[in-house]
Amino acid sequence: LDVMLNAIKVGVPCEDIELKWRKCIEPKGYIKKSRAGYPIGLGYPPDWGEQTYSLRPGDKTILLENMTIHVLAAIWTEDFGYEVSESVIVKEKGYEQLSSVSRQLFVK
């Protein structure tokens, strides 16, 4: 998750964020074919299919200030799955986290 979040800033193409994630997981033998993030906020123009921008290969949409994105680092296999995510606002030199919840992992 951090590798994607740290790549977010104004002027970066959406596909570049996803590429960071892919380069992180593929050497470990994992592949994720679905997007790594999607827009959030008021409305989903042009429709609920979210055909605006996504963190996926081929999406050349340039991140602009104050865009909102739900970024998710997720892997699903036949044996297990995991997902961690963060909702953020794109800023000039990075991102602003929308939640104040710690991402600390607790093991019982």
Language model: regions and residue ranges:
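Active-site neighborhoods and metal-handling regions in enzymes and metal-associated proteins
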Residues: 1-108
